[in-house]
Design a protein with these regions (language model features):
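Expand to "…catalyze enediolate/carbanion chemistry for C-C bond making/breaking, isomerization
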Residues: 1-207
Length: 207
């Protein structure tokens, strides 16, 4: 459920309405601009509800590491439409590359799942947009239409070849005592573990 931003007049009412909602799995907090927004929202909802931080402003991006590190933060999402209006740029991949990278780095540093990219308005542009999302290291994408789901899920899921390589590499590494043989082993091990983590999250392999 989307919750209005913590500085708005509607935030308190939103939280009150959801505090005792049965079956609530989590909320998306609009225009998150600090870790305190995460804590305040979580506490209003009882302290256990996962919160997805929607980054929609320059201030939010500048504090994204603090936001990601806040315990209630389940994940970060990129509110690309409002964000580009706030900083005054077009939705150009090059113009937004730094911003997307910051979300990826903050998520990884905080040990939370990879960030969720913003939606794509034109269905014809969705496949290329999903490809960009994946290349930037983001692991999810907001959808405007239910018909977007298959394209997004397919485009962001590890391929069978990637999963097979990752499993083989980890098995071989462990069978050799779990010690790197050279400097290239650790980066490849980290990549393999990320692939397997995503595959498990998506139900492609069993835990």
């Amino acid at each position: 459920v989307r919750v209005n931003d913590a500085s708005s007049d509607f935030w308190s009412a939103d939280c009150r309405a959801l505090a005792d909602a049965r079956g609530l799995k989590g909320v998306v907090l609009a225009k998150t601009e600090g870790g305190n927004h995460m804590w305040d929202t979580s506490n209003r909802l009882g302290g256990e509800t996962p919160v997805i931080a929607l980054i929609e402003t320059a201030r939010g991006l500048s504090r994204v590491h603090d936001i990601a590190a806040a315990r209630p933060c389940f994940r970060i999402a990129f509110g690309v439409n409002d964000y580009t209006l706030d900083i005054g740029v077009d939705q150009d991949p090059l113009a937004l590359a730094y911003s997307r990278s910051q979300l990826v780095v903050a998520s990884r540093a905080a040990h939370i799942p990879g960030p969720i990219d913003g939606p794509t308005r034109d269905p014809a542009e969705l496949p290329e947009a999903v490809s960009l999302t994946r290349r930037m290291g983001m692991t999810g994408k907001l959808a405007l239409r239910s018909s977007d789901a298959d394209t997004i899920n397919t485009g962001l899921s590890p391929s069978d070849e990637d999963v097979s390589w990752a499993q083989d590499f980890v098995d071989r590494f462990n069978s050799q005592g779990g010690k790197p043989k050279d400097g290239s082993d650790l980066p490849r091990l980290n990549r393999a573990r990320i692939i397997l983590e995503r595959a498990r999250m998506l139900g492609l392999i069993t835990p």
